[in-house]
Structure formats: C-alpha cells, structure tokens
C-alpha cells in the first residue's frame, strides 16, 4: 500500500474535439438557410477562434451553434473567452474567441491557498501550468477535489483531475 497519494489539477481541453466542433460548425453554417448567404468565416488558430460575418444577428447565431457543437463534443464551455465584437472592413463584424488553456500563476496561487487554508493534511505544489496535490489519505484528496470543484465555479475556469495515484 502506498504511503502517499497524489493527483494533478490541470486546465486543458481536447484540441481534436475542438477541431471537430469547428468542422461541424462550418458545415452547419454552409447548410442552414439563415446562415448560408451570410458569407461567414470561422478560423481556428492555436489559441483563438476568429468569427467573421455580415451582421451582429448572424454572429449571435454562430456563437450559439458553436456552444451547442462544443457541448455535444463534451468540451467545457468555460474554455471560451468571448471578446467584444468589432466592425472590420467591408461592413463586416468580427469576434475573437480566446481559448483558455493552462493555469496562470495567479490562478494556481488562489487555488493552492484555498486548499491549504481548509485542509492541513495535504500539500499543494505549483508545477508550471498545473498543480500537484499530495496527501497520506485518499479521503483528504477527495476533500481537496470538492474544494477545487467549488473554486472552479467561483473562478469560472475549467479544471480536470489527472494522474490520480
């Protein structure tokens, strides 16, 4: 029996599932009667999605379809950080959607402090863009996961738990 147990807390998403959701979104834009003539474009870059379309109304429709497709692909909607829309050349509307990936140092410190304040029997260490939580009891680690779940809702960030040993 192991003397200590641990798990990692990360903020990540499956990039291939996002690619699949964007492909489905593009297909629906080309087939839906209200979006077909809007001359809309959706580009997936490394850390953002750029949506370009003809009006605010079609932009809102495309946002809704994007969220719907992401939900069906089991992606957390918290990964999307919608920026305000802006007008671009040719009377078109453009919106940049940043993708949240990884824990920032500030966010990692907040999460670490929240767990250390409530649970004295576990240690939390920051490792780059993830957290490592170790403890002698699996029950303590389960309590830490509950605290992380509450903080996930408060701070509006997607969290996953990996390498539970």
From Swiss-Prot:
It comes from the Bacteria. It holds the Pfam family DUF520. CDD domains: YajQ_like. The keyword Mitochondrion does not apply. One of its GO terms (molecular function) is nucleotide binding. Keywords: Nucleotide-binding. InterPro entries: DUF520 (IPR007551), UPF0234-like_C (IPR035571), UPF0234_N (IPR035570), YajQ-like_sf (IPR036183). GO terms for cellular component: cytosol. Belongs to the YajQ family. PANTHER family: UPF0234 PROTEIN YAJQ. Nucleotide-binding protein. This is Nucleotide-binding protein P9211_04811. It comes from Prochlorococcus marinus (strain MIT 9211).
């Amino acid at each position: 029996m192991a003397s200590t147990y641990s798990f990692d807390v990360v903020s990540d998403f499956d990039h291939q599932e996002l690619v699949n959701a964007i492909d489905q979104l593009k297909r629906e834009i080309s087939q839906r009667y209200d979006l077909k003539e809007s001359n809309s474009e959706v580009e997936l870059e490394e850390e953002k999605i750029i949506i370009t379309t003809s009006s605010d109304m079609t932009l809102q429709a495309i946002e809704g379809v994007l969220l719907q497709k992401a939900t069906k692909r089991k992606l957390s909607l918290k990964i999307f950080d919608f920026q305000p829309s802006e007008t671009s050349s040719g009377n078109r509307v453009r919106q940049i959607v940043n993708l949240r990936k990884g824990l920032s140092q500030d966010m990692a410190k907040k999460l670490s402090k929240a767990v250390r304040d409530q649970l004295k029997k576990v240690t939390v260490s920051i490792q780059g863009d993830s957290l490592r939580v170790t403890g002698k009891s699996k029950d303590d680690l389960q309590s830490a996961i509950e605290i992380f779940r509450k903080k996930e809702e408060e701070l509006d960030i997607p969290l996953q738990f990996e390498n539970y040993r």
